[in-house]
């Protein structure tokens, strides 16, 4: 496992007189760069086009201004908020020896006023305050996001595209069912291979064939569904091909190990289990399977699921937990769930989250150990044969 970093605060001593600090508010068509330059009383603010080379020149120019003011710059620290642009700029700046950090968007505290002023200039000031506190090593100013390599980002694409295509296929099928229901036809399975050939023989309750415009719409939907189905199969075949070609390569080993326990192994490995997690609490927190306490004075209540982490992992684990109760009913975890919900049916939704959290932590421990042995796999869980 790679060495873990504390992303909640900086562990490097901040020499403010020798550190050039900059934050970037990244827009679709322009970037607003705000800086703290040692020796310069004004705090510069510069609007740039979406141009990384111009950004680098600006940072070098500010460094020259600081050196002219008698401050030798030893460190340039840059930060921007995680968002649509991803991590390419952070990787590019790091490659040019610029220390770059990506701020977790939801960790930045904002004013609770009902109508607060919000402009790019004000937001860069807010980011500067957060980043400066983080650089000083103070906690709770903001949190940073681990910057993945381009290979790690690319490894997530097949699963995410597969999820998107499956959702699109479901939407097309549901739309076809709704179209047929409008003319009184029910029970038609649009997923059958010969479904398109059967359309001409369908009749409405009045004994009439499907109207021509509706029939044409259904045929176009079937073409779209067939195309999406082929693309889903291509993704699944490519995934099996990668596992076959490099069975002992890092994440692929994890996938083959987890495949003995769960069918969502590839998604879990790429989204969470290949990441460096400090402990089981960090694993549960990343998946958003933790609670949201609301405590003040004598009030003690729970607001429910935090939902602050990776939604794909959270959704997949809760689905897996329900299936686990069906297919691993003799396991210790399934018995634990039944013992706590047997006389409290209203607690099932709460306890399924707890079961999902326990399962995720058990899978994380299994991947960390790298072998299937007693004490790692939960008691009573039946494994598939190794492949």
Model-predicted segments: where are they?
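A detector of single, family-specific signature residues
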Residues: 1-387
């Amino acid at each position: 496992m790679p060495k873990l970093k504390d992303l909640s605060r900086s562990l490097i001593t901040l020499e403010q007189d020798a550190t050039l600090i900059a934050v970037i508010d990244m827009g679709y068509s322009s970037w607003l760069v705000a800086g703290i330059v040692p020796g310069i009383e004004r705090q510069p603010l510069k609007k740039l086009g979406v141009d990384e080379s111009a950004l680098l020149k600006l940072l070098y120019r500010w460094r020259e201004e600081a050196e002219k003011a008698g401050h030798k710059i030893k460190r340039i620290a840059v930060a921007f908020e995680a968002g649509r642009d991803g991590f390419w700029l952070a990787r590019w700046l790091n490659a040019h020896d610029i220390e770059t950090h990506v701020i977790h968007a939801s960790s930045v505290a904002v004013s609770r006023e009902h109508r607060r002023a919000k402009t790019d200039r004000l937001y860069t000031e807010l980011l500067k305050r957060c980043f400066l506190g983080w650089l000083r090593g103070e906690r709770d100013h903001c949190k940073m996001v681990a910057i993945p390599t381009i290979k790690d980002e690319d490894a997530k694409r097949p699963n995410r595209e597969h999820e998107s295509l499956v959702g699109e296929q479901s939407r097309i099928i549901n739309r076809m069912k709704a179209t047929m229901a409008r003319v009184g036809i029910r029970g038609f399975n649009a997923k059958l291979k010969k479904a398109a050939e059967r359309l001409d023989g369908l009749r409405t309750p009045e004994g009439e064939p499907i109207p021509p415009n509706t029939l044409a719409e259904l045929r176009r939907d079937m073409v779209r569904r067939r195309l999406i189905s082929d693309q889903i199969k291509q993704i699944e075949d490519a995934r099996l091909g990668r596992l076959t070609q490099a069975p002992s390569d890092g994440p692929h080993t994890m996938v083959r190990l987890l495949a003995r326990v769960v069918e969502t192994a590839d998604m879990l490995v790429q989204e969470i289990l290949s990441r460096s997690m400090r402990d089981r609490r960090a694993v549960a927190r990343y998946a958003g399977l933790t609670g949201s306490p609301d405590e003040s004075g004598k009030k003690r209540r729970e607001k429910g699921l935090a939902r602050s982490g990776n939604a794909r992992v959270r959704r997949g684990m809760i689905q897996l937990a329900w299936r686990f109760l069906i297919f691993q009913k003799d396991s210790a975890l399934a018995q634990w769930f039944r013992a706590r919900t047997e006389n409290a049916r209203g607690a099932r939704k709460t306890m399924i989250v707890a079961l999902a959290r326990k399962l995720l932590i058990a899978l994380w421990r299994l991947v960390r150990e790298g072998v299937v042995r007693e004490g790692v796999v939960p008691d009573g869980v039946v494994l598939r044969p190794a492949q």
